[in-house]
Amino acid sequence: MAYSNILVGAGTRPAQPVVRRIGIADLQEALAKGIDDFYAMPTHAMFLCVIYPIVGLFLARLAFGYSILPLLYPLASGFALVGPVAALGLYELSRRREAGLPTSAVRAFDVLGSSSIGAITALALLLLTIFVIWVALANAIYIATFGYATPTSIENFANEVLTTRAGWTLILVGNLVGLLFAVLVLSISVVSFPLLLDRDVGAAVALLTSIRAVARNPFTMMLWGLIVAALLVVGSLPLFLGLTIIVPILGHATWHLYRRVVEPQAAPPPTHDEGHRERRYAADFPAVLFPWAR
């Protein structure tokens, strides 16, 4: 039963969320609201995302040992694949601010008590698996083009990649494969995590809703993916420190994008309609004698 709830939510027949058609104006609105949330909660957002520059600097330091230098780019770009998981606290803060609830930093961790935490964990593990597969494939592509030789220096590695046929093959094939992984993750996560924070629909419904959102808005969603990728590159340039601003804005904006693309949940119907209930006087006795008390 627990596994069933993770997949389909607490209800036996979860309502399928309604997906809207959106345009460029909706992306602009989502980004504007994301920036507004960041200005309203900058300390909280930067506290949640300080891990990004720390990890980036750690990877850069390891790269100077040259052993993982060929994987530095796949690792750095691959963090975008698990970014939706890291942004869960940002979604929660935006959700709470939208609802007029307290938005202190500790409230970001309310996601751990969400009724959908099982489904969220399942999708997080899926993204982590995709990330691991991406890094393994990136390593295989490097070995296929350059062999098992370890770069002797950063300058030597850059020269080999940028000035040789094998290097350009690595760049072309690696980025094409990376693009496929990025499209896959965008399709299954663009609204799935915000949806699970908003409603207990289960991992399967959330994942399929995200895919439907991309299928109905292919151009707009691909443009959103390009915006995310471009901003992450810009944020990574100054030793990854720009990510302390870029990631919070994108996280908040993703929540508002979800609000634009998925219709709000309708009010739940009443459990029964007293006006249409078949009268059973014997069963209702003696309450039937006092109709004003019902």
Predicted features and spans:
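Hydrophobic alpha-helical membrane segments
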Residues: 1-294
